[in-house]
């Protein structure tokens, strides 16, 4: 829960991101945060299914609180890295809420959203690092109008930002919509809370984009604002391609998850069903295509 981080054990994350260099922030967001969620999926829930069933309602509430808290805190940040760090608290809260929903759509969406979050948030930290390399400040108030000097960067930042906000057609949408459907099947009230992540994400990311890249240039004579060089394009363009591909063709990845998610839920929900009063887990080998027919 600390590693995820799950509210209220999240307090280390913003400070860690602010103090870390760009490469460490990317690694932390893209890989290390996922180790906590992986621990729940790989060890915690399968090894202790009855405990998971008993604590799932309470942990789901904490995850839902983290979604709203992380989004609201991101709205008031003055440092770009702190804003992205609190967005991670909100997005990982949605992932954990889906994990604790213990159904097929939510679990598959949680796994896919972990991949999406790693791509989008890692790319956000790369973009913040590029700006910091040029201006040597991460304060949002110290920036403005950078798109006039950095149009290619502004376009890439826009795609990354919209993917993090869950725009349809980009990678964040497919994972989020699966999480929402799964959470709705488990708890309609928490599903309503979870949807706020879309509204809050759009609010703080669009606010960040407007303050940093749009409007008049803060310092028209600043020679440091230059567009992306070949090295920066070499590591950002593949990420953009993957963001778009995962958004347009999520089935390529989700079909690979169907069988393993079904087996996972067999292991977790069979002993947990009596405790939570849940429906039986999907049959082993059940696919997304026949799942709806079996439910009918």
Residue ranges of each PLM-predicted region?
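Hydrophobic transmembrane alpha-helices and their helix-loop junctions in integral membrane proteins
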Residues: 1-211
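Cytoplasmic/organellar membrane-interface segments at the starts of transmembrane helices
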Residues: 150-152, 205-296
């Amino acid at each position: 829960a600390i590693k995820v981080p799950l509210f209220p054990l999240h307090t280390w994350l913003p400070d860690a991101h602010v103090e870390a260099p760009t490469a460490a922030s990317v690694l932390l967001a893209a890989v290390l945060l996922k180790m906590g969620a992986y621990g729940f999926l790989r060890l915690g829930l399968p090894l202790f299914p009855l405990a998971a069933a008993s604590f799932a309602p309470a942990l789901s509430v904490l995850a839902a609180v983290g979604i709203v808290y992380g989004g609201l805190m991101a709205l008031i940040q003055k440092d770009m890295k702190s804003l992205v760090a609190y967005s991670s608290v909100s997005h990982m809260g949605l992932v954990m809420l889906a994990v604790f929903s213990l159904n097929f759509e939510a679990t598959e969406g949680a796994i896919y959203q972990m991949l999406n979050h790693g791509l989008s948030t890692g790319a956000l930290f790369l973009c913040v690092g590029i700006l910091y390399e040029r201006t040597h400040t991460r304060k949002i108030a110290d920036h403005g109008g950078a798109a006039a000097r950095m149009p290619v960067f502004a376009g890439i930042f826009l795609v990354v930002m919209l993917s993090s906000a869950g725009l349809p057609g980009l990678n964040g949408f497919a994972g989020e919509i699966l999480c929402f459907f799964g959470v709705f099947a488990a708890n309609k009230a928490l599903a309503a809370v979870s949807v706020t992540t879309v509204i809050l994400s759009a609010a703080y990311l669009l606010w960040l984009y407007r303050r940093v890249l749009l409007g008049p240039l803060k310092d028209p004579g600043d020679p440091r604002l230059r567009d992306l060089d070949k090295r920066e394009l070499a590591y950002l363009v593949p990420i953009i391609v993957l963001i778009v591909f995962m958004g347009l063709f999520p089935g390529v990845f989700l079909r690979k998850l169907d069988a393993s998610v079904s087996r996972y839920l067999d292991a977790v929900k069979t002993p947990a069903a009596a405790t939570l009063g849940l429906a039986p887990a999907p049959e082993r080998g059940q696919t997304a295509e026949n799942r709806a027919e079996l439910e009918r």
